[in-house]
Amino acid sequence: MAERSIELDSIELAAAIFGSGDRNIRMLEKEFRVTAVCRGSELRFSGEDKDVTAAVRAIDGMVTLMQNHTPLEEQTVRYCMSLARGGEESRLRELTDDFVAVTAKGRPIHPKTLGQKEYLAAIRKNAVTFGVGPAGTGKTYLAVAMAVKAFKSKDVSRIILTRPAVEAGEKLGFLPGDLQNKVDPYLRPLYDGLFDLLGAETFQKLFEKQAIEVAPLAYMRGRTLDDAFIILDEAQNTTPEQMKMFLTRMGVGSKVVVTGDVTQIDLPEKTRSGLIDALEVLRHVDGIAQVRLTEKDVVRHRLVQQIVRAYEQAAEARTPKTENRAVSDDKR
């Protein structure tokens, strides 16, 4: 058995670290199989040496987050514990130091995981970035945040967001109403990110000036998109032909981010995903990056990680090795 004590700088810091009703400490006890005793600003752990060491590292990581004004939400604490188990809690500072943007309500945006940080670095460095991962990893929201930042910095003159309207088979002419009414239901997730980052009023003004364009993928055909930050969301639902069409729209001074989840393909049976195809065909092209986010990067409710993991395992069990090659290569 080993024992370690930690004296925090103040009662206020201790209260924030411990959480409401010592919630965070109870999580640490369960995760690392240690016993914790809290007295004032002092915290004492007892248990197996490696477990006590990991628990102390987790507290160090939480202190780092608090010093950088990062709220200790449940998922943040769980990620901190995950890094502490591998002795990487010091890398949390890399996340808090990586500033992306500020929302319309003044909330600063930082990557919440090391995978997200890698994704942002790839977007900054490359003309084309593929962000592939399950729901909840922030791949679309962070891409939109980077687009808004580039627009505000005048690195680009417009933002273009698109996704395949696969639910309507992209045959939007058969739907009632004008174009905007037809496509809004399929593009709503993209609007949500823009509203959060810009505010509804600013978004509307930029939209009316055509500085922001949100449109289904079918409406990209035949265009050259210069000086723009272009995001293709839900790319797993493109065909190889659609993906090639989209990527070749890129013009001078533009940056492209393609996001998707290869476990959520809604294409007709036996139709190959354009995302899987592109990941394979373009893997060695300079200036094109591929970042794989995993369940470790999920920043929603803790159950989402377990749900994602279960579905991925089921998909791998059902998928022939040849079809899965583009998904499994270069996994982080």
Spans of model-derived segments:
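Short amphipathic alpha-helix segments
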Residues: 13-30
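Conserved helicase motor core of SF1/SF2 NTP-dependent helicases
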Residues: 42, 104-114, 122-232, 236-332
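Proteins enriched for Cys/Gly/acidic motifs involved in redox and nucleic-acid/cofactor modification
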Residues: 78-112, 117, 124
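A short, structured beta-strand/loop element
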Residues: 29-37
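Short, surface-exposed acidic/glycine-rich loop or hinge patches that mediate macromolecular interfaces
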Residues: 11, 22, 49-50, 237, ...
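Interdomain "pre-motor" coupling segment immediately N-terminal to P-loop NTPase/helicase cores
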Residues: 37-96
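Short glycine-/aliphatic-rich beta-strand segments at the starts of folded cytosolic domains
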Residues: 1-16
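Hydrophobic side chains in well-ordered alpha-helices
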Residues: 17, 55-58, 243-246
